[in-house]
């Protein structure tokens, strides 16, 4: 049970962290593009 929960947490972090990072980069690029 604990292993499954830790696995889900690790998988969630592995997916959320890169996704949020790319999302932030996209938002910054989009905002800069609209400004200029």
UniProtKB/Swiss-Prot annotation:
Main location: plastid
Function: One of the components of the core complex of photosystem II (PSII). PSII is a light-driven water:plastoquinone oxidoreductase that uses light energy to abstract electrons from H(2)O, generating O(2) and a proton gradient subsequently used for ATP formation. It consists of a core antenna complex that captures photons, and an electron transfer chain that converts photonic excitation into a charge separation. This subunit is found at the monomer-monomer interface.
Gene encoding the protein: psbM
Membrane topology qualifier: Single-pass membrane protein
Subunit description: PSII is composed of 1 copy each of membrane proteins PsbA, PsbB, PsbC, PsbD, PsbE, PsbF, PsbH, PsbI, PsbJ, PsbK, PsbL, PsbM, PsbT, PsbX, PsbY, PsbZ, Psb30/Ycf12, at least 3 peripheral proteins of the oxygen-evolving complex and a large number of cofactors. It forms dimeric complexes.
Location in the cell: Plastid, Chloroplast thylakoid membrane
GO biological process: photosynthesis, light reaction
Family under the similarity heading: Belongs to the PsbM family.
NCBIfam families xrefs: PS_II_psbM
Name this polypeptide is given: Photosystem II reaction center protein M
One Pfam family here: PsbM
SUPFAM superfamilies per record: Photosystem II reaction center protein M, PsbM
């Amino acid at each position: 049970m604990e292993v499954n929960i830790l696995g889900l947490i690790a998988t969630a972090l592995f997916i959320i962290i890169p996704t949020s990072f790319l999302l932030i980069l996209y938002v910054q690029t989009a905002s800069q593009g609209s400004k200029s």
